[in-house]
Amino acid sequence: MIKSSLLIVKGDNSMLKCRDEVLFFTKQLVQIESIVNTYGEKEIAHVLHSLISSFPYFKQHPSYLVKSPTIADRLDRYNVLAFVKGTKEGGKNDTVILIGHIDTVGIDDFTQHADLACKPDELLKALKQEPLPDLVRKHAESGEWMFGRGALDMKSGVASNLYLLKYYSEHPNELEGNLVFLAECDEEDSSNGILSALNDLKLWKQEHKFDYTAAINSDFVAPRHAGDENRYIYKGTVGKLLPSFFITGAETHVGSCFEGLDPNLIAAELTRQIDYNPELCNEALGEVTHPPVSLKQTDLKPVYTVQTALAAYVYYNFFVYSWSPADVLLLLKDQAEIAFRNALSLYRERYHRFCERAGDVPREIQWKPRILTFAEMEETLFAAYGKEYKDSMESFKESLLLDDSLDARMYSARVVEEAWKWLPDKSPAIILFYSSLYSPRVEITGKNKREAKLIAALDRSVKEIQPSYSKPIVIKDFFPYISDMSFVAISDDETSLAAAAENNPAWGSKLTVDYDAVRALNVPVINLGPYGMDAHKKYERMEMHYSLEIVPNLANLVLKYVLEG
């Protein structure tokens, strides 16, 4: 293995000569097919643990490296954590955490090249033999891009962190505080990895007196628009909610369709009202989130019948920078009412036109928009039925947990469907709730000493590196993708988090997040990761110069400046 060394570049900067070693680590990791929720997650943790255990430092200090199982997980998965204690004179307990996930999304999109998806060199050769979009062709032939699942998202980021762990294990005398390496599983689905790792970080804080000063996440960055040449670093991260709508109508035989109300009509109007709606973009610190978009829209009929559906179910991705879960519920109740009114207006207009053509006399339409949050519905049912309702629903939830085919989203829908049966008033309605965990927003503004020090360290690092790199390195406030950054710091207050829990039917059974553990860690975090394009797509690729050389050096400088003084 290549010995970590320094490369002197123009100016007064000294940069780590790290490209070959980070490339070596990246290829090792990419070649392990570690798709989320598969055995591969376990395999990559074993390999990574074995690799780190071969470093001389960890042979001397084996207790500084752990392979830690995830908690309350139906799968046998592990995180890998390691730390180096600095021995530089004047060192303190200040500790920086390097974070990266080792799982990937699936490889079905690689179609005929699926067997090469995790073999970067072979994949590149195969891609060059087929028609490619112009930009992809240019990158494939340049020699400066690595293709393959996980090359960008985010095994090259983990490789960068691994390089720094190895470097400081060889040079602890250059480290003024402590360095923690965390490679977690399950980032691409439910964040069980990072949520489990909170316990290990807490334990090390107690045992080794670590004072967690900052965290650097190494997830990928990408162009924000066509022709964008910037390489971005992000302070904090976007938050993500999954607002969901259980919609009931009035069932009828399709031969008497105007005697009922199809919930799919309301669902369609709801999607028309919410999908891509710029009014639902959240602006903060001069940045704007992407608008919501639907991730599922269906009725809940299990089989074909000629009766209209009893209920429909839709949910939407929803990003936030400053809005709380309570804010989003209020906002979407208004949107749901607009959609309901639009659906009834369209229904009336078409009903009257039909009656004119058929020679029928239209009846008066009695339905009115009716919107309830899950918490409001539960409050009504607890008041009406008390313990009877509570005991029945707890038993129902327990029985649902036995069905492994239900993810948290469909589990939540079934709970709402069951609760709906208890309501005396069965007139058409929309029940609004959350059906997945809330990934909290993180806002890093310099509001305390730790945030201010991290921001100053980042600014200084970019200023020093920029003369050695031709592309602009730009710092922005919010990482625009979902990441595990959401679970190392927290910007929401307890009331906001309570709104997310109280309106989540799966909370406490299928889903639980210990936000108190996140708040206990509450370390300011930035994202400084590899650059590339087409993450989660078959042309996923990582630009090597920035990712393998600039990123490790930037992270090293941030680490150094956070810990010094």
Predicted regions and their residues:
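Acidic/His- and Gly-rich active-site-bordering loop/insert found
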Residues: L6-F147, E170-G177
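A generic structural motif
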Residues: V36, E187, E251-V254, F318-A326, ...
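An extended, acidic, His-containing surface patch that forms the Zn2+-binding/catalytic region
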Residues: I44-A45, H61, H352-G565
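A glycine-centered beta->alpha junction motif in the catalytic cores
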Residues: T104, F245-T252, G529-K537
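Acidic/histidine-rich catalytic neighborhood of metal-dependent amide-processing enzymes
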Residues: W145-G236
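Short glycine/serine- and small hydrophobic-enriched flexible loop segments
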Residues: L162-E170, E269-Y276, N556-K560
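Short glycine/proline-enriched loop/turn "hinge" motifs that connect secondary-structure elements
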Residues: P172-E174, Y234-K240, Y304-L310, W422-D425, ...
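Midchain, well-structured core segments that form catalytic/ion-binding scaffolds
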Residues: L203-R409, A413-R414
